[in-house]
Every structure is written in structure tokens, then in C-alpha cells.
């Protein structure tokens, strides 16, 4: 899968993320925070401790309007979904039904350069959906 042919849509807050705030980059980090539980008399780990799930990421968009940046300033929750599809019609949807922007940077590197917004986010467990992040797979 690649970002040119296979990203069918990026939705933020339920609406297509499009002009004037086109997405330029998106990253996602998932961590289960598992840990080894060592014990005397055991070769290797005696167990695996469960950790807290974390989903964080960053989205970079052209700064065509203040809409996303304003959500950061106001502390407003949002949502993000990314639909990936292959040429056969199979699809994978990354679903973050509730997230909060944790940091934002608006920058222009110089004259004749585009103004970009880089927003960091953290997914939060949705109260009715019951999850912070999910992958949904659909066969053609």
C-alpha cells in the first residue's frame, strides 16, 4: 500500500479532510506497554505484565484554515479515520473515534513556502464505542 494510490480517504471529525487543509503526512504509534515479569528460578520471563494501551500520532496539513488548530486551542475532542483500499477493492479502515490534539505547531520555513500545521494527538477510549483505536477489514 502507498500514499498515492491506496489512501482512499482521510476523515477528521466525521468530515473528509480536504482543501484548504489537505493532509501532507500522517503517523500513528500504537503501544500495548507489555512488560517482562522476571522471577527467581525461571529461565526468561515468568510472565508478561499487561500495560495501558496508547495510540498517539501526528498529522501534518496545509494551513488553509484555522479549523484544526482551533480544536487544539479549545481542547475540543475530534475523531480520525483513514480508509486504505487496494486495486481489488479490499479495504482497511483505521478508526480513532475519539482523540484530542495535544500539541500544535504552525510554521512557514520561508518566503514562497507553504504554511503548514503539525498537530500531535492521542486517542482516547470512546465512551459508547468502547475502544480508542480499531482496524476494520473489508473484503472485496
What are these regions (language model features)?
Residues 1-140:
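Signature of extracytoplasmic/envelope-associated structural regions
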Amino acid at each position: 500500500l502507498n500514499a498515492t494510490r491506496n489512501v482512499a480517504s482521510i476523515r477528521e471529525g466525521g468530515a473528509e479532510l480536504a482543501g484548504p487543509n489537505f493532509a501532507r503526512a500522517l503517523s500513528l504509534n500504537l503501544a500495548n506497554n507489555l512488560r517482562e515479569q522476571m522471577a527467581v528460578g525461571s529461565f526468561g520471563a515468568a510472565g508478561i505484565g499487561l500495560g495501558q494501551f496508547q495510540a498517539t500520532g501526528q498529522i501534518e496539513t496545509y494551513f488553509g484554515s484555522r479549523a484544526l488548530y482551533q480544536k487544539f486551542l479549545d481542547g475540543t475532542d475530534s475523531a480520525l479515520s483513514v480508509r486504505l483500499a487496494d486495486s481489488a477493492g479490499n479495504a482497511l479502515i483505521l478508526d480513532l473515534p475519539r482523540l484530542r490534539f495535544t500539541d500544535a505547531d504552525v510554521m512557514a520555513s520561508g518566503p514562497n513556502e507553504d504554511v503548514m500545521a503539525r498537530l500531535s494527538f492521542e486517542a482516547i477510549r470512546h465512551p459508547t464505542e468502547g475502544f480508542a483505536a480499531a482496524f476494520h477489514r473489508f473484503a472485496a
